[in-house]
Structure formats: C-alpha cells, structure tokens
UniProtKB/Swiss-Prot annotation:
It catalyses: dUMP + (6R)-5,10-methylene-5,6,7,8-tetrahydrofolate = 7,8-dihydrofolate + dTMP. It is found in: Cytoplasm. (6R)-5,10-methylene-5,6,7,8-tetrahydrofolate binds at residues 219, 313. GO terms for cellular component: cytosol. The gene is thyA. It holds the Pfam family Thymidylat_synt. DUMP binds at residues 21, 176-177, 216-219, 227, 257-259. This is Thymidylate synthase. Gene3D superfamilies: Thymidylate synthase/dCMP hydroxymethylase domain (3.30.572.10). InterPro entries: Thymidate_synth/dCMP_Mease, Thymidate_synth/dCMP_Mease_dom, Thymidate_synth/dCMP_Mease_sf, Thymidylate_synthase, Thymidylate_synthase_AS. The active site is at 196 (nucleophile).
Length: 314
C-alpha cells in the first residue's frame, strides 16, 4: 500500500533520532495520518506477507474481553508472548537462567539466544498444559479486551463499551460519541504494556461506516501493518452487524517510529512494488460480532511478497 510505504519513507527522511523505553533507539516523527478507502480492497501489506490469521485471532481475543495469552497460543499466535514471559522471569517462581534484557541480548548473543528460546518454549508449553500457571503468568493485566468489554467504573460497575457502541450506531448513527477507549489511567500501572492503539471512533455517512484510530505509539515496521488490518477488519465486522457498507479507515499516529534495528528491513520493503489488495470474506454463520471464530474470516486474492523478519523490542 502506497500510504504505508510513504510513511516509512517520510520517517526515514524526516524523522528524529530518539532514545526509547526498550533501549533499542528509534527514528521518530510526531503526528502522522493515513487514509484507506475500504471499498478499494482490504488494506493489508502486499510488499511483505502479514500473517492474517494472527490478526484475526488477536482481534477475536480482544472482542472476547480476554487478556490471557493462552487463547492466542491455542491458535498458534505468539505476538504477545514476550510481555507475559517478561512478567514470569521477573517473578520469584522463575528458577532458570538470568533473562535480564532478553530481547536485546538474544539479538546480540547467539549463545544466549538459544538459552532464551529454550526457556520461552518451556514457558509456552506450560501455559498450554497448566491452567493454574496460565491463570497466573499468562495474564497481561487489564489491557485492550478488558477495557473494551468490561471497563470498571468508580462505583464498581462495568461498561461494555463495544456492545454500547454497536447499539448506538444502530439507534443514533449521527452521534459524535461513537468512541471506545482502551486508555484507562488507573489500570496503566498493572498492564504488561499500556495500550498503543488507545482510542477509536466511528462515523456514519451516506450509508457507510468509517473508523478513525488514534495510536499513541506506532511501531511502523512490525506493529502498524497489524493495526491497519485489525481495525479495518473491526470496521467490516461492525458494518456487517449494523447493516452498513464500509467507508474509510483513518489511522492517526502520535509517536510514529522506526526502530534502529529495523532500518535495513524497511529499505528492503521500500524496494518492492505494491500488488493488488485482496478482498475480505466473512462467513454468514455468526449472528453477532462476538460469535465469530477464526475459520469464519479469510482473504481472497492475497498474494504478497515474502515476509521480512525483524526483532521485537520489549
């Protein structure tokens, strides 16, 4: 997609070198927006393969209000493993090798990388096999799904923001309050990772549903391709339920950054030419957005260039 490649190019040419929480370092810009017409095809990278089923299972995980990586691992989705693993290795229950700064060390030390990978595999297996262990160390805190589906009020009640949003689109589509927030300041200290994609708003006009996302922190190479596809999919799912066509997905970013250890991968991607976008295929079976399974969602005509691997910064 040209919009995304333009973002990569802009940050490479105009970004500012900054330090960051992970110690990796970034090239960053502040305030950037992309627009995608969802009528023109499903917005997923074609200049590198994005594993769409991982996008699907993560979004369904959010929709279920789940915050435990066990569901993700059951669907061969490893994208949240590092944050749960980090919590485990910092606990008194962990008795293995020192895992301090495991992400950076694994990138720089091949011997340590083997040790880390072995510990991670043991951790994943135990999450899948031991329910009590999973309940304790698979939890990531009150992240996205919890805030979307079960926001706790000061009175101790809960708000299902997503269900309320869908009902409001049906009954008051002209509302300017079609908003869901994952940013709950009270819960931030107890989250494995505070929400990067923190707030989204829907807009209805001319029989079409559009979505705008505000993302406070945008990992351009690894995270943003997932975010674009995830919120485009969410827009399609909600539009189906409320009887509207899809309009635009607008992606507004605060700190949009390229990690310093992703620069060569970005240059490789920029050398490639975008292909035709695929079409989203949804099963007619699910009655509501909350009834979808991974098998109910697929892409037709997705023929991307090969994947480009890059390290994740934790």
């Amino acid at each position: 997609m040209k919009q995304y490649l333009d973002l990569e190019k802009y940050v490479l040419e105009n970004g500012t070198q900054k330090g960051d929480r992970t110690g990796t370092g970034t090239i960053s810009t502040f305030g950037y927006q992309m627009r995608f017409d969802l009528q023109e095809g499903f917005p997923i990278m074609t200049t590198k393969r994005v594993p769409f089923k991982l996008v699907v299972s993560e979004l369904l995980w959010f929709l279920h209000g789940d915050t435990n990586i066990r569901y993700l691992l059951q669907h061969n989705n490893n994208i949240w493993n590092e944050w749960a693993f980090e919590r485990f290795v910092k606990s008194d229950d962990y008795k293995g090798e020192d895992m301090t700064d495991f992400g950076l060390r694994a990138e720089r030390d091949s011997a340590f990388k083997e040790v880390y990978q072995a510990e991670m595999e043991k951790f994943k297996a135990r999450i899948l096999e031991d329910e009590a262990f999973a309940n304790k160390y698979g939890e990531l805190g009150n992240i996205y799904g919890k805030q979307w589906r079960e926001w706790k009020t000061s009175q101790g009640e809960t708000i299902d923001q997503l269900a309320d949003l869908i009902e409001m689109i049906k009954t008051n589509p002209n509302s300017r309050r079609l908003i869901v927030s994952a940013w709950n300041p009270e819960d931030i200290p107890n989250m494995a990772l505070p929400p990067c994609h923190s707030l989204f708003q829907f807009y209805v006009a001319d029989g079409k549903l559009s979505c705008q996302l505000y993302q406070r922190s945008a990992d351009i190479f690894l995270g943003v391709p997932f975010n674009i596809a995830s919120y485009a999919l969410l827009t399609h799912l909600i539009a189906r339920e409320v009887g509207l066509e899809v309009g635009e997905f607008i992606h507004t970013m605060g700190d949009a950054h390229l990690y310093n250890n992703h620069i060569e991968q970005v240059k490789e991607q920029l050398s490639r030419t975008p292909h035709k976008l695929p079409k989203l295929v949804l099963s007619d079976k699910p009655a509501t957005i909350f009834d979808f399974d991974v098998a109910d969602i697929s892409l037709d005509g997705y023929n991307p260039d090969p994947a480009i691997k890059a390290p994740i910064s934790v």
